[in-house]
C-alpha cells in the first residue's frame, strides 16, 4: 500500500485551504446546525449589526482553527496525531458552516481578513508540528482553551432573545472543550507562559479587526 508523501499532503492542504476560504453557497456538514429548528427572533438593526460583528469574529476564529489543524497535520510525525488533527478539523468545518449561515441570516458576511489569518495559522501549525507532536498538541489545547473563554464572553454579550446564535455558540464551546481535553489526553505539553501571552495578543488583534472588517 502506497504511503502519502509530503507532496501528497501539501496538495491536500491546498485543497483544504480553498475549501475553507472560498465560500460555497452551502457547506457540506456532518451535523445539523444547533439553530436549525429554532424560530427567528425580531432584532433591531443595531442588535443585528452587533451580533454580526461577533459572529464574524467567531467565523474568523474557526478559519484560524481549521488552518492550525491543517498546518499541524502537514508536519505531524505520528499517524494517530495526523488522524486526530483531521478529525478535529472536520468538526471545525461544521462550525464554519454554522457561523456562515447565521451571518447570512443576519444580512452580513465573513471577514475580508480571513486569508491573512488563515496563512498565519497554517504557518504556526506547521511550525508547532515541526517542534514535535507533544508541542503541537499543546498548541491545540491552549488554542481551544482560549477559544472556549472567548465564546463564553460572546455568550455574555449576546441579547438573551437571540436563541439561534446562543445555541450555535454553546455547541461550538462544547466541541472546543472536547478538543482541548482530547489533546491533553493524547500527551500535550503545557506551553510556556510567554507563548500563551503571545497567542492571546494575536487573538485580540484578530477579534478586534474581524468585528469590523
Curated annotation (Swiss-Prot):
Involved pathway(s): Cofactor biosynthesis; ubiquinone biosynthesis
Binding site for Fe cation 2: 92, 144, 176, 179
Binding site for Fe cation 1: 62, 92, 95, 176
Cofactor note: Binds 2 iron ions per subunit.
CDD domains listed in its UniProt record: DMQH (cd01042)
A GO cellular-component term linked to this record: plasma membrane
UniProt key word Nucleotide-binding: no
Record's subcellular location: Cell membrane
Swiss-Prot/TrEMBL catalytic activity: a 5-methoxy-2-methyl-3-(all-trans-polyprenyl)benzene-1,4-diol + AH2 + O2 = a 3-demethylubiquinol + A + H2O
Cofactor(s) the protein needs: Fe cation
Enzyme class (EC, first level): oxidoreductase
Gene3D superfamilies reported for this sequence: 1.20.1260.10
Pfam families (alphabetical): COQ7
Family note: Belongs to the COQ7 family.
Function field: Catalyzes the hydroxylation of 2-nonaprenyl-3-methyl-6-methoxy-1,4-benzoquinol during ubiquinone biosynthesis.
Protein name per Swiss-Prot or TrEMBL: 3-demethoxyubiquinol 3-hydroxylase
Gene that specifies this protein: coq7
